[in-house]
């Protein structure tokens, strides 16, 4: 594979029977969970395929990437108000009123609730689900793969920013691809005059400092 089109047309890896069984079970459960939100279901399955392809391209475990993609928007079955209420019940603290960051909470809530339901899912998958909306100062390759896949999967519109990220697939390192996607997301929020979580600013500053130290700029 050399680019975005190859990523999205990749052949499924040769998973073992247990892995195929869990993938099928999670996909079926997701279809039930998001039965009333077909667009979200289609997006989730598309992210799973994109994440799997990116993982194959960048040397990340494609099985874990596929699982993370399937599960990342699980809590989107709930309304924003219900996600906020559930986050409060779980004691999630974002440092600000949770209603201000409602769009960021679904991954965090899922990562807290779903491990008990699916204990066979590796913990690093749950971490990727947790940070797929917020990012974090320390992002594993799996975290980066899910974050990027969520933004560039083919059902997303062909905006200049998304197309720019798609064009980088395979021609730049995963860390640089993630960085462009992360910064593009911040720009999108700012252009829309929406609330930018202070934690995002902190993550940006820490990642930027780390890239500067590494000579990436």
Please tell me what each predicted stretch does.
Residues 2-36:
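Generic N-terminal amphipathic, Lys/Arg-enriched alpha-helix
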Residues 12-19, 171, 175, 193:
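Intrinsic-disorder-associated interaction segments
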Residues 28-34, 43, 52, 56-179:
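Divalent metal-dependent catalytic cores for phosphoryl transfer on phosphate-bearing substrates
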Residues 182-185:
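C-terminal beta-signal and terminal closure region of outer-membrane beta-barrel proteins
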Residues 187-217:
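Charged phosphate-binding loop/patch that engages nucleotide di/tri-phosphates or the phosphate backbone
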């Amino acid at each position: 594979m050399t680019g975005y089109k190859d990523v999205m047309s990749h052949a499924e890896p040769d998973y073992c029977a247990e892995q195929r069984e869990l993938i099928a079970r999670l996909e079926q459960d997701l279809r039930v969970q998001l039965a009333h939100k077909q667009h979200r279901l289609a997006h989730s399955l598309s992210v799973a395929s994109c994440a799997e392809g990116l993982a194959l391209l960048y040397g990340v475990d494609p099985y874990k990437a596929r699982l993370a993609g399937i599960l990342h928007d699980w809590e989107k079955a709930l309304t924003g108000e219900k996600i906020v209420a559930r986050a409060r019940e779980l004691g999630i603290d974002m440092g600000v009123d949770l209603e201000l960051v409602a769009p960021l909470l679904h991954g965090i809530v899922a990562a807290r609730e779903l491990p008990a339901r699916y204990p066979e899912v590796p913990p690093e998958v749950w971490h990727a689900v947790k940070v797929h909306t917020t990012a974090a100062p320390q992002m594993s390759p799996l975290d980066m793969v899910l974050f990027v896949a969520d933004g560039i999967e083919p059902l997303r519109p062909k905006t200049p920013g998304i197309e720019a990220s798609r064009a980088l697939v395979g021609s730049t390192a995963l860390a640089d691809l993630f960085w462009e996607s992360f910064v593009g997301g911040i720009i999108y929020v700012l252009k829309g005059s929406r609330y930018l979580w202070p934690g995002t600013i902190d993550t940006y500053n820490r990642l930027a400092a780390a890239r500067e130290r590494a000579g990436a700029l």
